[in-house]
């Protein structure tokens, strides 16, 4: 006897309690225990979250093809993020969210027109005529100003150029400095000599 045939015989002899589900029924083989007086009817339900199997969300790929997001792999999502300059780490849902927000922001930016003020063109009907006299006057004046400004600048003389010898006050300062350093140098060896006390 095969196992499937044995299962049918058992299910026919012992009618089980029907487990009501959203489209399926199931006969449980342990229903003899539940048929005792006082046993209650058992209903088994399978609750499944209501996620849509298909979504109409799509992305515009680089080559302008529209592809639904179910077909995207993590590798393709990372390539899309890289091409848009977005962060590459995270889960598939994070990558999708980044792409969605980036695409929605770029669509908003492209739909908003920026009204730039038109550049005004200045049209000159009559060109300005310049005579040689105007050019020569202008050139002469600028050269003249440059020459006069060079002549009026004061020349600063450095002390080395003016005085090649020492002044009397400089001699006094150097002589005093030399004497103080000699005194200090002579006093130092005397202080360092050990004194012997008897």
From Swiss-Prot:
Signal peptide: none annotated. InterPro entries: SAP_dom, SAP_dom_sf. Belongs to the AIM34 family. Keywords: Membrane, Mitochondrion, Transit peptide, Transmembrane, Transmembrane helix. It is a single-pass membrane protein. Residues 69-103 form the SAP domain. Residues 1-55 form a transit peptide. Disulfide bonds: none annotated. GO terms for cellular component: mitochondrial membrane. The chain crosses the membrane at residues 172-187. It comes from Saccharomyces cerevisiae (strain RM11-1a) (Baker's yeast). It is found in: Mitochondrion membrane. This is Altered inheritance of mitochondria protein 34, mitochondrial. PROSITE patterns: SAP (PS50800). Pfam families: SAP (PF02037).
């Amino acid at each position: 006897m095969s196992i499937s045939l044995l299962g049918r015989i058992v299910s026919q002899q012992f009618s089980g309690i029907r487990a009501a589900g959203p489209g399926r029924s199931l006969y449980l083989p342990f229903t003899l225990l539940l048929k005792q007086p006082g046993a209650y009817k058992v209903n088994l339900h399978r609750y499944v979250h209501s996620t849509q199997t298909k979504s109409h969300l799509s992305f515009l790929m680089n080559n302008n093809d529209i592809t639904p997001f179910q077909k995207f792999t993590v590798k393709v999502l990372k390539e899309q993020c890289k091409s848009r300059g977005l962060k590459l780490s995270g889960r598939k849902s994070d990558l999708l969210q980044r792409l969605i927000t980036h695409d929605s922001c770029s669509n908003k930016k492209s739909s908003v027109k920026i009204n730039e003020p038109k550049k005004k063109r200045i049209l000159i009907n009559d060109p300005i005529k310049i005579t040689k006299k105007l050019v020569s006057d202008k050139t002469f004046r600028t050269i003249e100003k440059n020459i006069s400004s060079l002549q009026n600048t004061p020349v600063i003389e450095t002390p080395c150029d003016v005085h090649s010898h020492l002044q009397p006050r400089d001699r006094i300062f150097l002589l005093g400095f030399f004497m103080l350093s000699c005194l200090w140098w002579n006093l130092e060896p005397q202080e360092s000599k050990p004194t012997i006390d008897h």
